[in-house]
């Protein structure tokens, strides 16, 4: 697994359970045994049967849950990264074998389809995961629903499926390599040993001032709260965006502190970071003082602009203005903004040198959320004239329909 640290070792150490993985891993998994197609495990009234489902990786497996008290009927299947709700697994982790892996995934999906329409599907990821771009916001589904609605099942042939997969554009965050190695060797600490603590008063003072800040300050409050008032130089990564995009902006040697609404929010965010291997978390702040001067207001506030204003700027563009779209490539291909420059959000750290700090940038995405993340990063890098297209593509489409 490459997007977070597995809890398998910690769970095994606490319970004495054995750990198993598929037979064809790229490297030996030091803490686990191998399980192959057809292997069965008896747990109480349940039988768990391994189904080899290569494609996402060579050792991918699914696990069929059979209820022995219901005449040995299969009830559900844990599909890992093979089948999601409204999406199927990535096949790009082997660049030299992408066609082969896509073909294997097609075969694996047919194996799952043959289990029966009533089988409940429990995937490993949900909406917002880097492991697929079209996942629906539901925690489970059924084989029958996916056969009817999942784009991966709508391909008319194996050839068509392979062609579809080869056209996909996925992103591999820099931290993936550390996650892969951590999960090969095994880590016993997928969660922080204690809850995130509020910073002491003297430490708060240092973190509040951008010139004295000893690391990266991440604001995990809502986008609206960040735009209204934030600490200059902080990075806005609330909710699932922290795990989805934090790995593009953070390194493992730099301390991190959080700005949060509550102890619970700070703790949940620190747990996300810990699962990604970021363990230098100093603590959190809760209060963001309101600016007391016009100059401070401009440093702590991000303007939001609406679709009609963006339309006005597009129709009568100024030489120093640019609409900057930070969505994924496939989103841009499906619906483009007129006259926009495209830089994927995760690529901003390596590509922001292409941007001119003297220009005025309006950040856009699908809804305004990722645009706010991008704005926070550019402001932290010294860009001064930045605002956010509120609603972004959703608002743009509604505006055009109304117009």
Region spans (language model):
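Divalent metal-coordination and catalytic microenvironments
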Residues: 11, 53-56, 63, 81, ...
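A contiguous, basic/glycine-rich beta-loop/short-helix subdomain that forms a polymer-engagement track
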Residues: 193-202
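Divalent-metal (often Zn2+) His-rich catalytic cores of metallo-beta-lactamase-fold enzymes
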Residues: 70-71, 76, 85, 99-194
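Active-site HxH/HxHxD metal-binding segment of metal-dependent hydrolases
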Residues: 1-50, 66, 73-75
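Rhodanese-like catalytic fold shared by cysteine-dependent sulfurtransferases
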Residues: 90, 145-181, 185-187, 192, ...
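Active-site neighborhood of phospho(di)ester-bond hydrolases with catalytic His/Asp-centered motifs
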Residues: 1, 19-24, 52-55, 77-80, ...
């Amino acid at each position: 697994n490459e997007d977070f640290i597995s809890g398998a070792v910690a769970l095994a150490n606490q319970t004495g359970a054995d750990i198993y993985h598929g037979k064809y891993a790229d490297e030996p998994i030091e803490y686990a045994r191998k399980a192959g197609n057809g292997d069965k495990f008896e747990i109480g009234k349940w039988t768990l049967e391994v189904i080899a489902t290569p494609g996402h990786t060579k050792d991918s497996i699914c696990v069929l849950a059979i209820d022995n008290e219901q005449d040995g009927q299969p009830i559900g299947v844990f599909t890992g990264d093979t089948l999601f709700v409204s999406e199927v697994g990535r096949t790009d982790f082997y660049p030299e074998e992408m066609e082969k892996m896509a073909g294997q995934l097609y075969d694996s999906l047919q194996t799952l389809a043959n289990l029966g329409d009533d089988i409940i599907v429990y995937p490993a990821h949900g909406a917002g995961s880097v492991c697929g771009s079209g996942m629906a916001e539901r925690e489970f589904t059924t084989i029958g629903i996916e056969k009817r609605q999942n784009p991966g099942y709508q391909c008319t042939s194996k050839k068509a499926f392979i062609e579809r997969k080869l056209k996909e554009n996925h992103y591999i965050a820099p931290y993936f390599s550390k996650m892969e190695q951590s999960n090969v060797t095994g880590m016993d600490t997928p969660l922080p040993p204690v809850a995130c603590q509020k910073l002491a008063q003297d430490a708060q003072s240092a973190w509040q001032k951008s010139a004295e800040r000893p690391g990266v300050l991440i604001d995990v409050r809502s986008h609206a709260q960040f735009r209204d008032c934030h600490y200059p130089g902080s990075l806005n990564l609330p909710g699932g965006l922290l795990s989805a995009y934090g790995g593009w902006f953070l390194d493992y040697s730099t301390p991190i502190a959080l700005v949060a609404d509550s102890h619970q929010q700070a703790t949940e965010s620190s747990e996300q970071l810990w699962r990604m291997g970021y363990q230098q978390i100093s603590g959190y702040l809760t209060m963001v003082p309101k600016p007391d001067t016009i100059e401070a207001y401009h440093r702590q506030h991000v303007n939001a602009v609406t679709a009609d204003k963006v339309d006005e700027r597009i129709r009568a563009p100024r030489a120093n203005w640019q609409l900057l779209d930070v969505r994924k490539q496939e989103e841009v291909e499906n619906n483009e903004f007129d006259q926009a420059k495209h830089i994927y959000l995760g690529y901003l750290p390596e590509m922001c040198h292409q941007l001119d700090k003297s220009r005025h940038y309006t950040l856009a995405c699908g809804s305004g959320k990722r645009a706010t993340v991008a704005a926070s990063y550019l402001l932290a890098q010294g860009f001064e004239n930045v605002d956010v297209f509120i609603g972004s593509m959703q608002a743009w489409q509604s505006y055009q329909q109304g117009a």
